[in-house]
């Protein structure tokens, strides 16, 4: 999330949102991942503070949740945005948010969840075009199973296996270390919390352990991590049998 690196520098999220609205995308609609730290704080507390900037923006700001229960997050977001920004009523009598704001969820949307979201919005008198729904790795990589006569979907994504690639470290103009991390409060499965700063992996009696929160120089000492991809090129290629040996302690 772009919010993580900005938070590490600015100490808040509102500065970056203003920058996105007025400098980066002043004449375009864009979606903004909003759950890097505290999604509902951003929706309920930060958005009202920049209401004028959002309404003056030449485009639509789409508030994107990316953790928690998608059905609850999407529908509750629409309700909160209506309280803050208001809107109009269409010809069928359904509420439509101000065109400068909308809710979006880019992943974890199955057909069943989509139907649930639309059903709840209709129940509370909101038009379904208040939300945008996407299809991503969750939707494409779920295994469908039957349990107790009902269909269940088991996700197998990068978050399931903890292999998502996230930036965790940067340096300022004067070389000062900047620790980047994300820790969404809405992440009920604890899949998305990232390490902070540079990391060191070391061998233990049980396998491997790690230490984070390090500077670049500190992470170079006794580190089992090896660079395999840098500046668009492979620097080292591991065979599958090598990966298995590392994983299982050389056996």
Predicted regions and their residues:
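Buried, small/hydrophobic-residue-enriched core segments of structured protein domains
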Residues: 1-91, 109-116
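Domain-wide signal for the mature, well-folded portions of proteins, strongly enriched
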Residues: 25-31, 53-55, 93, 170-172, ...
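Short helix/loop capping segments that flank catalytic or ligand/cofactor-binding pockets
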Residues: 41-43, 143-144, 237-238
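Short acidic (Asp/Glu) and glycine-rich catalytic loops that position anionic groups and cofactors
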Residues: 56-60, 94-98, 225-229
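C-terminal active-site-proximal or functional interface alpha/beta core segments in diverse enzymes
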Residues: 61, 66-175
